[in-house]
């Protein structure tokens, strides 16, 4: 074998993202993805005197909580030490936590929980995270609880024990990533709107006692930069925010006026996910995460519902649960079988033992004892549910006007002044907003972003409570398809025909931007045929990669299963002709002709394809990310940009690749590994590249058994391309 490695500074960003590691990340992709490989995290704050004075001010402040104005940011240098080398990154740090248990004196030296934002590099793909004093999260309970939730399918952050040193003071801390884009992708979700409970009114707001204004606290957006990316993301965020605000308003009205402990249901009781999440937290003694100000939310455009993001449950896994009143006598806890499964327990133990520094024997003891108590708590919860009479008369959903009136009454009682926006309407590139008092103004997208993320406008506290949530789904159809066991959501102009006998699904566009989303379907032995309209026959208005419903594909398949499936697509004006998300199985054939942009885009999936053919694509012919992909035969022609693009920690193997005409043949990026037995590429400027492009990943690898190509090979310092003898 011969190695062709060319350092080519074609992108300053790509070559410097991990320039401060004394090893090539591609050589240790599996190791740097394992928490146990991290031996120590060292943080040095150059302005140590100011940093220590900040600690002293927090310690001696007269408030019970940590004053927000003392959570100042400090520049820092962060070093991650492994057995095989170390990385040094620029970072910013600040005090973390609400209460003063996040600061302690250890042998006279200051130890504090801190928020860290890396300006370069990453730790286990995270660029924003917390280093927490273990006692603030009940130590091992937080690590194990986060793992169990993630294994059950909930969104939960990467969490592990790690040895640290901050300005020379050593301690064991809990590493926990923040709720961000990287967290979503780790949990197989595409970037989208993120929200949390609004805390501004809780902590020393205008000298009100802590928590005295909790009945006025609703929610806020935590990723306004995503909102500002374009009109589609603005549309999605505002629609979701209106729905969440109404749910939070309902909660405050019921909880604080009627005295009933109700969960927050942002999906309007149409889904059991928040009920199941609450029950799971109860049996794990993690109900602290259900406090409104600890709640975090993700809006999933594919399921068209909110999902909870775990945060700060204060788990006590080995204690009997304090169980609330059951939801109803018909409720069945959904995770009973899995929590009793020995295979599930073994998977959890393996993950746990690599994330703690107490040794395997103590780890096994802790896991076994925790599961024994959780199982008993589940039993008690189910027995309590079985014995309850269905609730009647206790809870009646109040109307939005009633909830709003009572909210305004409480606002007057507390003498809290807030501007209240009641409607938002897009006018060209700005927004026409109306207040409850009827006053109208024009706000820019940046001003709207500040309202929904900070509840502020021009220095004044301002909240958005939509009196009428606009029905923005009037141009969609939803259909349950019994033959494949799932649902289809699609544009009204699109034609959908299902032939159960021939196992064919035929889809035809009226407008070239029409689209369809299949959710949770089983396509065993089925053929999907998508007949698209010509690109010039389109009323397409969106300017981002996705439309106002978050779809990038003409044909979208979400959480679906394949076996001997065939997919044929022709034309259409979507960013992806075919988009497969979070799906599994084997596909016999995919054929795409005249793709407007990407031909085939697959994300967060584990899929094998026997034959894939793309003939003409306005961008990439094949683009995969965040998954495991195996293909026998790939035939690509006339790819405007890349023939094959593999990114975001993917593994792709292929037997044969035939490509004619592309700017770049194969691109392996961002901790991905490509292995192609035989490739023949003609009409390309660059045969292959292996690079790191995103901060949250490392280098990439591409291995060719044989590569017949006359173009360039591009490799950055963290990556490698290996070619067989020709």
Regions found by a protein language model. Give the residues of each.
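Regulatory N- and C-terminal appendages and interdomain linkers associated
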Residues: 19-90, 304-305, 368-502, 509-510
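ATP-dependent phospho-/nucleotidyl transfer catalytic cores
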Residues: 180-281
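Short, solvent-exposed loop/turn and secondary-structure capping segments
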Residues: 54-56, 102-105, 185-189, 291-296, ...
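C-terminal catalytic region of ATP-dependent kinase domains
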Residues: 238, 285-286, 298-420, 427
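Extracellular beta-rich repeat passengers
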Residues: 456-726
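Conserved ATP-binding subdomain of kinase catalytic cores across diverse folds
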Residues: 81-218, 283-286, 302
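Bacterial N-terminal signal peptides
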Residues: 4-15
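Active-site acidic catalytic loop and adjacent metal/ATP-binding pocket
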Residues: 116, 266-313
